[in-house]
Amino acid sequence: DMEDDFMCDDEEDYDLEYSEDSNSEPNVDLENQYYNSKALKEDDPKAALSSFQKVLELEGEKGEWGFKALKQMIKINFKLGNYPEMMNRYKQLLTYIRSAVTRNYSEKSINSILDYISTSKQMDLLQEFYETTLDALKDAKNDRLWFKTNTKLGKLYLEREEYGKLQKILRQLHQSCQTDDGEDDLKKGTQLLEIYALEIQMYTAQKNNKKLKALYEQSLHIKSAIPHPLIMGVIRECGGKMHLREGEFEKAHTDFFEAFKNYDESGSPRRTTCLKYLVLANMLMKSGINPFDSQEAKPYKNDPEILAMTNLVSAYQNNDITEFEKILKTNHSNIMDDPFIREHIEELLRNIRTQVLIKLIKPYTRIHIPFISKELNIDVADVESLLVQCILDNTIHGRIDQVNQLLELDHQKRGGARYTALDKWTNQLNSLNQAVVSKLA
């Protein structure tokens, strides 16, 4: 496993055979010591560490065998959870990148170490790791590695919701992709898209739709790049969230579908999440189209997480509150644990409750609020706030008598509007009739 071993060992050894002077006697000892140490790695990692230390003692001047030994020591310490020692060894390895190994080899090695350590869930450790790397790269002038490390640090700040620190990194990243006159350098399209994706995620998390909209449009106009589908997935997912929050359900639907296809292509588990969002947009736009008719989405139709969402759709379309809430309860973790879905499920629940409420109160002039509460299966306080909302937006004409816990309906007012319209219509007919009569006279 290439990632597991900080690059395939055979490839490393191949590199070394041609870069070392094979007549140099000490190299044979170093090589033997290195391979003996490596043989101990699986069964006795602690003995392997002592043995790799001997490689460092034998090498005298910094060279590739020491570099290789340090890589193995970083890996073993990471696996053993000896993080302070791992950091010490990493700092030691970074002193080799200026002269002891070739630029290309050190870049490949650090890249693979970064990818490997990035699997850790220890935020503080990762932060120290990335910052140490960036410090070492200040002198090394390695733009690609600098960009990659900064992007990883940016993602870390995004996860930790440290937006001030993230903005500082975004500024540096943007500057690295600008022309002399401060415009986006379109020759760096792929990197630009990565920066946009990071920034778009930040504004999505902050619910700053104004900034998000401008960036989102810009990102879709970068044509020079061959974007990684994962990056495009991130951008389209954020676009979908933005459109959904603005009530543009069809645009959201399109974006979530594009995001799903991109995530699917890159093998990202976010594809299932985006399918859920697609179903959500489908409900909100009251679409009759089945999102699972498409060739890409069909294989996921019976995925348990997706199934819960599709069952939700049919309960929603039938205004079946009991079933809707039952599905939410049974599948609480895979629906309501997602803050974005939770944000909109409440809107869907309000829509259903309003429909049921209107049907429920139709025959009455006065109705007890506790009775509505029982029928809708929500607290009296929630019924009152729903009624207030409906009265304010003229869905219901009436008033709440809080003392007696009653809703008094003004059917006359409701009929009154109809009566006024009829009256207006009769008057118009009258005047039309008079105009015709006077013409004929």
From Swiss-Prot:
Q: Does the keyword Transcription apply?
A: no
The record's Gene3D superfamilies line, in alphabetical order, gives: 1.25.40.570
Single GO BP term: protein deneddylation
Key word Cytoplasm present in the record? yes
Compositional bias (Acidic residues) at which positions? 1-23
Q: Which InterPro entries match?
A: 26S_Proteasome/COP9_Components, PCI_dom, TPR-like_helical_dom_sf, WH_DNA-bd_sf
Q: Where in the cell is it found?
A: Cytoplasm; Nucleus
Q: Disordered: where is this region?
A: 1-29
Keyword annotations: Cytoplasm, Nucleus, Signalosome
Cellular component per GO, a single term: COP9 signalosome
Q: Record's family? A: Belongs to the CSN2 family.
Task performed by this protein: Essential component of the COP9 signalosome complex (CSN), a complex involved in various cellular and developmental processes. The CSN complex is an essential regulator of the ubiquitin (Ubl) conjugation pathway by mediating the deneddylation of the cullin subunits of E3 ligase complexes, leading to modify the Ubl ligase activity.
**Protein name, as recorded:** COP9 signalosome complex subunit 2
- Which organism does this record belong to? Xenopus laevis
